[in-house]
């Protein structure tokens, strides 16, 4: 069966989700097979990019149904600076269970680095709070960057950060975000990452008084696990629906958002496609 979807230029002007479908097809057609840490094996490409205009709908995939609650709860967990899965489990989210130790701890993962990066002189840097303040005080700065990749802590993390650095950009009253993802599980992980960082952009824009611009997703190692190839081919047979609209509460405290503050309107999607997580 052919896996071709659309060439990249047409994909960009047709339905924005076709960029993701084109990435699936690209990996199936051009990916290099390699062994990996999990023992499953991957088919991968290197250096790809997709982008979404957040004024034209919320980029949650429609060619397979996603569990939006997990995406929202995980993002709120990151923003809390939490690194224990208790909050996730209390809210019915199990996506980190496989990596936690017997006490539910994950080591100094995303939340720790985002909210309390430890410096050599004993200080702690809250990157997210600093980001918000700097966006308000100096929107034209080129330093609106948050990184989760801390070489001093990587060996102590249950899973080193896959989506490891993001940058915000302000122009014409709009806030855009670019994410660099060093390792991208394109079938299972990337759909979550797209929605998560798009949502973060909407939240930060609301807090700092800007309109949402673009979410740009840049990939390093973009791969399909070898046990996801049939699922990817199945997804490629599906036509996307219009993107839904995300409504969020009018809050000015980024850390004051709760799950009930988000409403996704008009989400129509094809059925979920089951695939196993490689740990």
UniProtKB/Swiss-Prot annotation:
Keywords, sorted A to Z: Cytoplasm, Methyltransferase, Nucleotide biosynthesis, Transferase
Pathway info: Pyrimidine metabolism; dTTP biosynthesis
UniProt-annotated location(s)? Cytoplasm
For this protein's source organism, the top of the classification is: Bacteria, Pseudomonadati, Pseudomonadota, Alphaproteobacteria, Caulobacterales
* Enzyme class, broadest EC rank: transferase
Tell me what this protein is called: Thymidylate synthase
Q: Which residues form the active site?
A: 162
Q: Which biological process terms from the Gene Ontology are attached to this UniProt entry?
A: dTMP biosynthetic process; dTTP biosynthetic process; methylation
- What EC number is given for this enzyme? 2.1.1.45
Domain of life of the native organism: Bacteria
Entry's Pfam families?
A: Thymidylat_synt
**Encoding gene per record:** thyA
Family assignment? Answer: Belongs to the thymidylate synthase family. Bacterial-type ThyA subfamily.
- Residues that, per the record, bind dUMP: 37, 142-143, 182-185, 193, 223-225
> What cellular-component terms does GO give this entry?
cytosol
- Asked whether the UniProt record includes Methyltransferase among its keywords, one would answer yes
**CDD domains associated with the record:** TS_Pyrimidine_HMase (cd00351)
* Cited function: Catalyzes the reductive methylation of 2'-deoxyuridine-5'-monophosphate (dUMP) to 2'-deoxythymidine-5'-monophosphate (dTMP) while utilizing 5,10-methylenetetrahydrofolate (mTHF) as the methyl donor and reductant in the reaction, yielding dihydrofolate (DHF) as a by-product. This enzymatic reaction provides an intracellular de novo source of dTMP, an essential precursor for DNA biosynthesis.
GO molecular function terms attached to this record? thymidylate synthase activity
Name the predominant localization.
Answer: cytoplasm
Relate the assembly described in the record: Homodimer.
Q: Which InterPro entries match?
A: Thymidate_synth/dCMP_Mease, Thymidate_synth/dCMP_Mease_dom, Thymidate_synth/dCMP_Mease_sf, Thymidylate_synthase, Thymidylate_synthase_AS
Q: Does the keyword Cytoplasm apply?
A: yes
Which chemical reaction does it catalyze? dUMP + (6R)-5,10-methylene-5,6,7,8-tetrahydrofolate = 7,8-dihydrofolate + dTMP
